[in-house]
Amino acid sequence: MPKRPTAGKVKQGITFFLAGIMGDTQRLQTISTKNREIARTVACNSRPIEWGQPPVLTGGSSLIKIELLAQNNHELVFTSVVHRIDFDLLKQSFRKIRKSESAGVDKVTAKEYAENLDQNLYNLYERLRRGQYVASPVKRIWIDKEGGEKRPIGIPVLEDKIVQKAAAAILNVIFDRNFYNFSHAFRKGRSQHMAIKDLREQCLKQNISWIVSADITGLFDNINHELLKDMIRRRVSDGGMIRLIGKWLNAGVMEEGNLTYSETGTPQGGVISPVLSNIFLHSVVSG
């Protein structure tokens, strides 16, 4: 391993990178023990709905409760969250996903699904509640790029998009407060423009004289499944949620009738892939 530079302009550049890490680490250590125990009790005492009950309508209040707990208790481990994916959250998720995209391997379009939306979502909700939900393979197609090259595109089936959107909403409210301030990708209220603005401000404040531009090649395709699940368990120790994520990770890819599987990578085109990649990268940086 190369030695870390210790002098001159390079040292100033390293200080800039570590500034966000050190600041956020100190923030994570200010949690009140009393508040942590209260929140832990609330989370552990949450229970799934009983069989035979009608679809639960929460109006998003479940996510608000989870977010408040996560805000005030950055080390809290949530043990029961998968049941928050109820009928109402599924319906909200359907409204938020892009409707213009192509159909997946089941050939069901958003327009067709919406013709009997409540019944379709109720059936989906029942399969989730009974543990009968099965993730479908992602359909892979290739599109042209400049220069004559082609790029693979993954198209999940509509129901997988809906459930992934709901699960991603839960994971985001739990993990987002832990992410570093210098992390901008796929986060609500953040953008490339904000990243550039923050970088400029840090450069002016700390007299930064150099910047490294780097890209992680094939990030989504090379995330180790077991490591990812271990990282998620640090905040979400819910077997139901972990199994649900595992179904998407192991669903495989369908290309021209051939089904293939991989032990690495998040779902191609998956709505949940961005938050999974953020969790993974945050854990790598944190150590």
Task: List the predicted regions and their residue ranges.
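Conserved aromatic-histidine-acidic binding/catalytic patches
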Residues: V82, E112, I155, E159, ...
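Conserved polymerase palm-domain catalytic core
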Residues: R127-W142, E146-G147, N178-R190, M194-G287
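Duplex nucleic acid-engaging cores and interfaces of nucleic-acid transaction enzymes
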Residues: L158-A168, W210, K229
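Amphipathic alpha-helical blocks
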Residues: E112-A135
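Non-catalytic, polymerase-adjacent accessory regions of viral genome-replication enzymes
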Residues: M1-K107, K111-D118
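Electropositive, glycine- and tryptophan-enriched low-complexity nucleic-acid-binding patches
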Residues: Q164-K165, A169-H184
